[in-house]
């Protein structure tokens, strides 16, 4: 299945073309997502900053290469090469110099996964260090 699992390419390339073809949309794109989709939104915006005018994430996992659930998912989707995982880790991408002007994250503090899996403070910290508005 993973040979054909190309969600990044679908969201970045195919979906915008589909939307532009079927809806009265402008060329300006924003991206948002919840949970794993929030991770995807952050990664897409950070890796393609000229393509998106804004990024919003709701309860995203922000440092997946550093937490048990993310490590398990990355091993399944990307294999055991941990260097490849960093290309899909928002905190790592920002620390490597990837930029967006502003990131909006909404995260409930009572979320059962907040401390162990989501690690939102890690994103806040790296954004402050790199002068990215949150």
Regions found by a protein language model. Give the residues of each.
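Non-catalytic cap/lid and distal C-terminal segments of serine-dependent acyl enzymes
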Residues: 1-134
């Amino acid at each position: 299945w993973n040979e054909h699992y190309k969600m990044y390419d679908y969201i970045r390339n195919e979906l915008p073309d589909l939307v532009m073809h079927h809806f009265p949309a402008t060329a300006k794109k924003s991206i948002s997502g919840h949970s794993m989709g929030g991770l995807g939104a952050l990664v897409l915006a950070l890796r393609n900053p000229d393509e998106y005018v804004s990024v919003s994430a709701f309860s995203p996992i922000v440092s997946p290469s550093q937490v048990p659930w993310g490590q398990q998912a990355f091993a399944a989707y990307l294999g055991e090469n941990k260097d490849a995982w960093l290309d899909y880790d928002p905190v790592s991408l920002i620390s490597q110099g990837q930029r967006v002007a502003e990131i909006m994250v909404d995260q409930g503090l009572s979320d059962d996964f907040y401390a162990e899996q989501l690690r939102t403070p890690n994103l806040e910290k790296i954004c402050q260090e790199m002068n990215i508005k949150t």
